[in-house]
Amino acid sequence: MYTAEEREQIIDIVDKMSLLRQDFDGAFTWIKENVAMPFDFDGEQQFISDLKQLVKINALKFGKIYEGVLN
């Protein structure tokens, strides 16, 4: 389980990778390799889903569409 500060740091990293660097695939890979909350599976899945949605929205701002971005 992440503290609120840790969650903000993770969101900031993902946001910077996907928005400032436009490294959308790298952001998805970073999420996959670095985000895990072993004692809160439902919370982990929701947090990961929210992070991926952030990347998809940032990609859309640059005209790149990932599947599921409009869901």
From Swiss-Prot:
Protein's name in the database: Gene product 38
- State how changing residue 6 to G affects the protein, per the record: In P008H2-7; confers partial resistance to bacterial AbiQ
Q: Which UniProt keywords apply?
A: Early protein
Describe the outcome of a gene knockout: Cannot be generated, suggesting it is essential for virus function.
Q: Where are the transmembrane segments?
A: none
- Nucleus recorded as keyword: no
Domain of life assignment: Viruses
Task: Tell me, in a sentence or two, what this protein's role is.
Answer: Involved in escape from killing mediated by the bacterial AbiQ protein upon infection of L.lactis subsp. lactis strain IL1403. 11 distinct mutations in the protein and 2 in the ribosome-binding site confer on the virus the ability to partially escape killing (i.e. the virus grows in the bacteria), in some cases probably by decreasing the protein level.
Q: Does the keyword Iron apply?
A: no
- One Pfam family per UniProt: Phage_gp38
The organism named in the record is Lactococcus phage P008
Induction / repression: Expressed early in the viral replication cycle (at protein level). Transcript is detected 2 minutes after infection, peaks at 10 minutes and is degraded to a smaller size by 20 minutes. Some smaller transcripts were detected in bacteria expressing AbiQ (AC Q9ZJ19).
